[in-house]
Swiss-Prot record:
Subcellular location: Mitochondrion inner membrane
PANTHER family per UniProt: CYTOCHROME C OXIDASE SUBUNIT 3 (PTHR11403:SF7), CYTOCHROME C OXIDASE SUBUNIT III (PTHR11403)
UniProt catalytic activity: 4 Fe(II)-[cytochrome c] + O2 + 8 H(+)(in) = 4 Fe(III)-[cytochrome c] + 2 H2O + 4 H(+)(out)
Annotated family: Belongs to the cytochrome c oxidase subunit 3 family.
Pfam families: COX3
UniProt-listed PROSITE patterns: COX3
Stretches that traverse the bilayer: 46-66, 90-110, 138-160, 167-187, 207-227, 247-267
GO-annotated cellular components: mitochondrial inner membrane
Name this protein carries in UniProt: Cytochrome c oxidase subunit 3
EC numbers: 7.1.1.9
Oligomeric form and interacting partners: Component of the cytochrome c oxidase (complex IV, CIV), a multisubunit enzyme composed of a catalytic core of 3 subunits and several supernumerary subunits. The complex exists as a monomer or a dimer and forms supercomplexes (SCs) in the inner mitochondrial membrane with ubiquinol-cytochrome c oxidoreductase (cytochrome b-c1 complex, complex III, CIII).
Alphabetic keyword roster: Membrane, Mitochondrion, Mitochondrion inner membrane, Translocase, Transmembrane, Transmembrane helix
Gene: COIII
Amino acid sequence: MTNLIRSNFQDHPFHLVSPSPWPLYTSVSLLNLATSAALSMHNFNNSYYLFFISLILVISSMAFWFRDIISEATLLGDHTLAVQKGLNLGVILFIVSEALFFLAIFWAFFHSSLTPTVELGSQWPPIGIEPINPFELPLLNTVILLSSGATVTYAHHSLIHGERKGALYGSIITILLAIIFTVFQGVEYNVSSFTISDGAFGTCFYFGTGFHGFHVIIGTIFLAVALWRIFAYHLTDNHHVGFEGGILYWHFVDVVWLFLYVSIYYWGS
């Protein structure tokens, strides 16, 4: 469907998208994934099989959800003004809910660090914990993630101005930086001297940075889908709601990492 014909179909306030089962399927799959992960940590029988099955269900639900959204937007022309507003509102509410989740993580961290108990040695970091140097790999990861925020903004502005090559190159560089960040995060976990079982410090550190790393992976998937859609001429200079949602999510990931770096890596060490 050409951009001119698609704009004629979408330039009205009616909601054309049919109810989708994928949000429910994805939510149930994520619940099973979290439950099976907790059971696996406590070595329940066959919990690892349930974990991998749940992971496959999450990935497949997301894939089918992406497929339907792309078909509705590009092939059917169902993403009218009302649908676009609903998608934007959904992204904003999703980010707000994630921000509240991270608020709980920071609350747990500052509660433990500002009032360390006797079991922690009445000090922070607790006795026996050697924190990670914030000016080594964490600082490099900070530069990498902030650079990815700049490159994705460049890709966005390039798409708005009709510069397809700039949008492609900016998106590719952003995804590469995201992959490098994820790899370095794994290296950091591998060389650290403490684990998630080492008291409140280890739990808050790995839960906060690990949950952020999970968001980086999700954001990378969003941007990879947007890159494919740019490559396939699905996105235009005035219609790229999915790309804008992925960019907004990526900037949220950047901001959360800054709070993690300053509080957990720098101040917490």
